[in-house]
UniProtKB/Swiss-Prot annotation:
This is Uncharacterized protein SYNPCC7002_A1590. InterPro entries: DUF1997, START-like_dom_sf. It comes from Picosynechococcus sp. (strain ATCC 27264 / PCC 7002 / PR-6).
Length: 192
């Protein structure tokens, strides 16, 4: 029995004035990743690719697993940051990977409002498709779907919380030239 879970999270935050524009900061992807991801769980594996290891997650008190996602993150010439999943693993659920598919897409872009103040606006979409393992065949599908959707929402809300809490603060530190106090990628482990 196949099932699909989905969550969408939207973000909008104001950007305070600083000596350097937010567009420059968005081009420094290592800074951006360092600000929104736990450096202890993040590894840079190529110039625009990062492997993120999430904290272990429980599902319906039956399964505990750790999602590991490889993301391509880049900034285009219009200063829009794009996120796309390239690969994934679910440590602890290896026997259930048949038919499993995870897709992450996202974007973040600077927008000037009527008063010429900068805002960052974006969204992230997380989708999972899988074949339900036999132990869940007898669980009402609506309960499984509701639980799966909630789990994905919680993942995106954690990332959004980190973005709202850390990104602007890190940008201000970076823009004022105190890079050593910012999250600018120096803490990311690199493995080409």
């Amino acid at each position: 029995m196949a099932i699909r879970f989905q969550a969408l999270e939207v973000v909008a935050l104001s950007v305070p004035e600083a000596p350097r524009p937010i567009q420059e900061y968005l081009q420094d992807i290592d800074c951006l990743v360092g600000a929104i991801a736990d450096p202890e769980r993040t590894e840079k594996i190529a110039p625009d690719q990062y492997q993120l290891k999430m904290r272990p997650i429980g599902f319906l008190d039956l399964y505990k697993f750790q999602p590991i996602v490889t993301l391509k993150i880049w900034c285009d010439r219009h200063y829009q940051v794009h996120i796309k999943s390239l690969d994934y693993q679910l440590r602890g659920l290896e026997p259930f990977m048949k038919g499993f598919k995870l897709d992450v897409t996202g974007r973040l872009q600077p927008i000037a409002d009527e008063q010429e103040q900068w805002l960052l606006e974006g969204e992230a979409d997380l989708q999972v498709k899988l074949e339900l393992p036999p132990p869940l065949w007898f669980t009402p599908k609506a309960l499984v779907k509701k639980t799966g959707d909630r789990l994905l929402r919680e993942i995106l809300q954690r990332i959004k919380g980190q973005l709202l809490d850390q990104l602007v603060r890190d940008y201000q530190v970076w823009a004022n030239g105190t890079r050593e106090n910012s999250a600018c990628g120096d803490r990311l482990e690199t493995h080409p």
